[in-house]
């Protein structure tokens, strides 16, 4: 019966004026239409839009359902950031020290390997042949004479 009276009052007012009763109608029509499962979905999709429309209308009627929606939103908000923060923190901490620890010994072993064979052992060739490939290629190209043929 109340909805019938509200509708007649809304139609009696000019179009420029919008009474608070119509806002209450909007919230009342949305609340029964949305079951608890859909309330969570709508809260996830648009949490900001539901709160402002429900709060200024009538705090007495929609209070229990808005409180439930707010509780659901609070629970969802507290659950979502916590796992994300926990997942990123452990991944970052162990990920950074492991590669650094692996790389440092590799460089040390390479340096010791290059330093150790620098001194020729018995029966080995001199260290000149142990030059890097780039140096050997440069010396080979510079030492080879270029033959020009005159015709």
Swiss-Prot record:
Residues 17-31, 65-80, 103-113, 122-133 have a biased composition (Basic and acidic residues). The keyword Acetylation applies. Residues 1-151 are annotated as: Disordered. Keywords: Acetylation, Allergen. The N-terminus is blocked. Transmembrane segments: none annotated. Residues 36-45, 53-64, 134-144 have a biased composition (Low complexity). The modification N-acetylalanine is found at residue 2. To kiwi fruit protein PKIWI501. This is Major latex allergen Hev b 5.
